[in-house]
Curated annotation (Swiss-Prot):
Mg(2+) binds at D146, N175. Catalyzes the acyloin condensation reaction between C atoms 2 and 3 of pyruvate and glyceraldehyde 3-phosphate to yield 1-deoxy-D-xylulose-5-phosphate (DXP). Belongs to the transketolase family. DXPS subfamily. It comes from Chlamydia muridarum (strain MoPn / Nigg). Thiamine diphosphate binds at H75, G117, H118, A119, A147, A148, N175, E370. Binds 1 Mg(2+) ion per subunit. Binds 1 thiamine pyrophosphate per subunit. GO terms for biological process: 1-deoxy-D-xylulose 5-phosphate biosynthetic process; isopentenyl diphosphate biosynthetic process, methylerythritol 4-phosphate pathway; terpenoid biosynthetic process; thiamine biosynthetic process. InterPro entries: Dxylulose-5-P_synthase (IPR005477), THDP-binding (IPR029061), Transketo_C/PFOR_II (IPR009014), Transketolase-like_Pyr-bd (IPR005475), Transketolase_C (IPR033248). Its cofactor is Mg(2+); thiamine diphosphate. It catalyses: D-glyceraldehyde 3-phosphate + pyruvate + H(+) = 1-deoxy-D-xylulose 5-phosphate + CO2. This is 1-deoxy-D-xylulose-5-phosphate synthase.
Amino acid sequence: MISPLLQHISSPQKLRSLSLDQLPLLCDEIRNRIIATLSLTGGHLASNLGIVELTVALHYVFASPEDQFIFDVGHQAYVHKLLTGRNTEAFSNIRHDNGLSGFTSPQESNHDIFFSGHAGNALSLALGLAKGASHGSSHILPILGDAAFSCGLTLEALNNVPSDLSKFIIVLNDNQMSISENVGNIPQGISQWIQPPKFDKIFQKIHSWMRKIPGFSRQKSELLHKVDIALKSLSHPLFEQFGIHYVGPFDGHNIKKLIPALEAVKGLPYPVLFHVCTAKGNGLAEAEKDPALYHGVKAYFKNHSPKKKPLSSEVKTPSSFPQHVGHILCQLGEKHPRLQVVTPAMSLGSCLEDFRKQFPDRFTDVGIAEGHAVTFSAGIARSGTPVVCSIYSTFLNRAMDNVFHDVCMQELPVIFAIDRAGLAFHDGRSHHGIYDLGFLCSMPNMVVCQPRNASVLERLLFSSLLWKSPCAIRYPNLSTRKEVSNPSFSPIFPGEAEVLCQGDDLLLIALGHMCDTALAVKEQLLDHGISTTVVDPIFIKPLDTELLQTLLSHHSKVVVLEEHSIHGGLSAEFLLFLNNHNLKTDVLSLGIPDIFIPHGNPETILNMIGLTSDQITLKILAHFNFSAPIPI
């Protein structure tokens, strides 16, 4: 049910028609809308509950889209969407088919300036906007939250802010969290800069006392508030060294104080850092108690009763690739007493909490700093210590040069556990892990592989410590299984593929979890009288050239199947192999087309790009002219 005030807010202009006294009720309605929606769809919950009052205040004081808001990270923009004409059925389906993106998207609204999904870029983008065009009477407001302020790119941009840049307000949404608790010196430093709570309490008492004095007018009260803001701006000189005027901190949940404070900094002829303190998960008791757990949720309500998803330590039998990785790393930690694990702010998502708790001195979360995570891991490896760098595929893109310069060029045996390889579905274009093979396979010394199930994953992780070379083990966030329960197994070495089944008419090479799809296609082709050899290459680089040459001696028709961009993946490596060995064969390459893939449900996305088993079967029949395509 749409709320009484919120249902009338079709634009920020409509918001500004409300009185100040109505805004707290509106904030409650917004929270209820977000909680009710995400209980059915899942999404980024805690961050958006924490930014409600701040977003309402920003839209109340400034005039978007003339005043430009840039959210960092973009997942904290749900409130912004509700206030900018998107409180519709599309919001009710957020991150799903026919729904809004879970991040800012210019395709949805001119109130969204950029697509956003990765952290730390807002300040650079905002400075570019200011440099590239005269914004006249308009303001530019990068809104930094969830540890975006401590990203290296943010600090680089901070060093580049002109001291005479007017109408430029950096809003720091300080919730002392990223996805989980902040790490490192910068967030701790910010906490130390915050004024003691006693200061605000004393000032409130003075204000309350003075209001009782006869003749104390509203104008004098406003003047006193301006004195409060001035004192807040004088108390922390650090940003002044950057030429940035600091104001704060302010209570991010007191909208009646936020609005006059924002009015006071509006139109200033120099850059301002507006520091707001919020509580991630505010307004939902469970999320306030455990904001990390409620950062990103699945549909977690049943009969309006919150259902907690289990922490990794509560998972007795791993069922997904990330859970198996977390379990195997704990086994490796026991076997190798010097093994180190490094991650850039993805301990919970990548199921590393058990390792962190079991081996706290051998676990490092570097925060949202992917380049540093890679180079830090390189330093560990150079010391002779085994190290696993656990990182999402989409975030590894940000550290490509670190992989090249600090790992591969140095020939250091860093083991990259690359999570979320493949389609991210609900998170959309910024989070699909479908581009990493293009640069990983181009780097000398790098071994690249992908397991089809938990058994192969286990062999790869245990064996990778024997390879003594940089290696990337990529895997999706999908359910998987172990084929055997026997803990003893033989090691596997780079360039070893596996034949899953033999046939005479077609060779089907499928990468990782796509082997399951390939085996389903094999059965469908059998209905057409076509027998298929299915091969799991395991290694994209190096390929098992000996096995492939043997198979190609009696297969003239080949299909390469992968959930990766058709450019730069397994198919590209296979075609290079054919060219290098002067082999001629008919190859059908099936992968992800050269477009940005939107968000949506798995079935919808796979159908859109033609990677369902039915579609693959029809493409094979048509391409090789086995028979006229028959709908299945």
